[in-house]
UniProtKB/Swiss-Prot annotation:
Membrane recorded as keyword: no
Gene3D superfamilies (UniProt xref): Transcriptional regulator MraZ domain
Protein name as catalogued: Transcriptional regulator MraZ
Family, as annotated: Belongs to the MraZ family.
Origin species: Lactiplantibacillus plantarum (strain ATCC BAA-793 / NCIMB 8826 / WCFS1) (Lactobacillus plantarum)
UniProt-listed GO biological process terms: negative regulation of DNA-templated transcription initiation
Subunit structure: Forms oligomers.
Upper classification of the organism: Bacteria, Bacillati, Bacillota, Bacilli, Lactobacillales
Any GO MF annotation of the entry: DNA-binding transcription factor activity
Major location (coarse): cytoplasm
Amino acid sequence: MFFGEFEHALDAKGRLIIPAKFRELLGTSFVITRGMDGCIFGYPAERWATLQAQLDDLPLTRKDARAFVRFFYAAAAECELDKQGRVMIPATLRQYAKLEKQCVIVGVSDRFEIWGAEHWQQFETETAANFDDLAENLIDF
């Protein structure tokens, strides 16, 4: 399970260090793609295969399903970590998530997310202001 928040710098070549505890869960190959809220989603290969099967079950006749699947898959990239534990983030994904120098890598259960630090701070501030209401409407601790 992915959890925690880690800040790392994106280097000049577009490489980002993935936290050691996440590397253990990712194995040799994983997939990154466009995520919700302007971040990048990252999935271990096994979870990606499950998600792929779910997306394959969406009805081709629905315009919104076609648009979502097309947009989601178009930016997907199969990745491997280098010897320093870095992943190369493709330019299209860096642009989509507005990644600059500082990035935040966040664990979210079965996936991880990559955010630009400024965008993450904005999301965190907005969400913190509504956290009690979100919890009340979604889950009983």
